[in-house]
């Protein structure tokens, strides 16, 4: 069965969370996989590992508890959020391989814009070398224990939930957004981690195009 792609536009986070959870709870072996692409109004979301101390000053931005993995992150306009609703058992892969494919889809999307995306062991998501986001060298290292994130910027966040072999939640790619809300949190629980978007590193991409490109990559990596 072909994956169904849905472009939701700008939608409330909590409403979307409830909808994808309901979809996952009621789907059957015959339900086609879906890929939801959207953006959210400003919101902080806390994953299952989230700690209150990592929300430094939420201010007027709501904080919503979520059942995805990970800690606190931010969603807002100018960010492409992708929610793949996938039957992993039918696809024939386990969670570790699923996460690898999600990250690979982001890496290949960035590659299309000339940007080199990197994985960081133990820190899900995709990162760029702030000194040379277009080069093919490794990230700066070894890390300085006083500033372990020096020279590294996070450009995509990832957090998933798997229930009855089926995934929901997903990933967020920063395209052209107001990044100042990230200063109100320790992104993903990491103090000092800088968050960037494509615009910050000199890649002027329209979020609609980025959503289409990311959607294409996700479909290619998550289809049988």
From Swiss-Prot:
**Where in the sequence is the active site?**
188 (acyl-thioester intermediate)
InterPro entries listed in its UniProt record: aa-tRNA-synth_II/BPL/LPL (IPR045864), BPL_LPL_catalytic (IPR004143), Octanoyltransferase (IPR000544), Octanoyltransferase_CS (IPR020605)
EC number of the protein: 2.3.1.181
Protein keywords: Acyltransferase, Cytoplasm, Transferase
- Report the catalytic activity: octanoyl-[ACP] + L-lysyl-[protein] = N(6)-octanoyl-L-lysyl-[protein] + holo-[ACP] + H(+)
GO BP, sorted A to Z: protein modification process
User: Which top-level group of life is the source organism from?
Assistant: Bacteria
- GO molecular function list: lipoyl(octanoyl) transferase activity
BPL/LPL catalytic domain residues: 29-224
Q: What does this protein do?
A: Catalyzes the transfer of endogenously produced octanoic acid from octanoyl-acyl-carrier-protein onto the lipoyl domains of lipoate-dependent enzymes. Lipoyl-ACP can also act as a substrate although octanoyl-ACP is likely to be the physiological substrate.
Q: What else is known?
A: In the reaction, the free carboxyl group of octanoic acid is attached via an amide linkage to the epsilon-amino group of a specific lysine residue of lipoyl domains of lipoate-dependent enzymes.
Provide the family line. Belongs to the LipB family.
Q: Which NCBIfam families does the protein's record reference? A: lipB (TIGR00214), PRK14342.1 (NF010922)
From the Swiss-Prot or TrEMBL record, give the protein name: Octanoyltransferase
Upper lineage is: Bacteria, Pseudomonadati, Pseudomonadota, Betaproteobacteria, Burkholderiales
